[in-house]
Amino acid sequence: MKTLLIFTLTLLCSGCLEDTAVTPINTINPDSVEYYGVAAANNAFAFDMYSKLVQLESREKNNILFSPYSVSAAMAICYEGTEGTAKEQISNVFYFPANNTVFKVRLKETNDKVYSGSDGYELENANAIWVQEEYPVKEEYIFNVKNYYRSEVTNLDFVEKPDESRDAINEWVEDKTDRKIKDIVPKGSITDDTRLILTNAIYFNGKWEHEFDKKMTSKKTFYPTKREEVSVDMMYISSNFNYSENLKAKIIELPYKGNDLSMYIVLPKGNNITEFENNFTVNEYTELKYNMESLGDVETSIPKFKFETKTELSDSLIEMGVADAFDLKLANFSGISEIRLLISRMIHQDFIDVQEEVTEAAASTTVFIGSVSSSKSKSREFKADLPFIFFIEDRRTDCILFMGKVEYPEYEGTGRFWSLPWNK
């Protein structure tokens, strides 16, 4: 799995945003972040962000995939240099503590755990800041992003050599994502006003602890809605997995080799994913997950799926409460430079590939700135032939690294849809 985020800070002379109604979402008390820690803050933001992406999905009818951990990590680099009300708003939406020292120390501790890795999988993280040559970035900011965020800092000539700069950044992105994300910085996006580009990349490639047997994969029917069917490649395995259920949903844990990371799949009962996800909270997810037990084999069927998504996050973040950072008059990144900066655009692009042996995914964000248990003797079934929500999580820290929804699974040659004249 690979995740990439790109943040571009652009100095603009005009084009301020209009006044925007701010609707912050408070899943946890931001004042309590220091008590909850980085994982609780990250996971609360994950569910807030998911609720916003659902609103976009309702208009475009797509699957959902994003990396809350990467979005938060990239925004944290911005937060390091943010002051005033812009800082307060980022703190509220991302649940960052007001104390920068506490935050960056805690974040570094968490990152060190998440990326300590093992021989059973590959999980890497990389940050980079690309700065316009001779642009006055504060030395303290450069020191902090290098030491606490493990960020590279490279000078480029955006003004005189925009194409060469674009090529250098795109090559870095492709290298960090195993060539899954290409041309993340499109032609014409680097202008005379571009001053900084911040990139964050996460790469994950892991094999299942219990691999699915390819011989058991067969064509089965998946029901995206009560009136639609699609033929999919359904994988099957019967093994001793952690599992639980309540009146609303089932959950199963599919660990990766090394047992540091797992995929959790939440399967709502019935076929009404919209109603379920509109009421599904981080606390309910945590309770459902922590009620899991390993009581014997679970007959598990999940579809192979492979898809890409690309989402403009700027409007969603503004609606969530990060408004000032996108407004030239109100943005305050004085911790980065004395020259006024703003975030003008933020794009998140993702890729995921789930098959019998491995999971691989990539995500990219570009910001332009200027329990019911069964007995042991009874076989349990987890048949994901309806839309489901999935998480890829670090078990050591409980941080959600990736979150998404599969409503229309497709995998190279599959995905033939037809409507039903009846309700399932």
Curated annotation (Swiss-Prot):
UniProt cross-references to InterPro entries, sorted A to Z: Serpin_dom, Serpin_fam, Serpin_sf, Serpin_sf_1, Serpin_sf_2
Pfam families reported for this sequence: Serpin
GO MF: serine-type endopeptidase inhibitor activity
Domain of life assignment: Archaea
Entry GO terms, CC: extracellular space
Signal peptide location: none
Keywords: Protease inhibitor, Serine protease inhibitor
Family designation: Belongs to the serpin family.
Name by which UniProt lists this protein: Uncharacterized serpin-like protein MA_2613/MA_2612
Lineage per the UniProt record: Archaea, Methanobacteriati, Methanobacteriota, Stenosarchaea group, Methanomicrobia
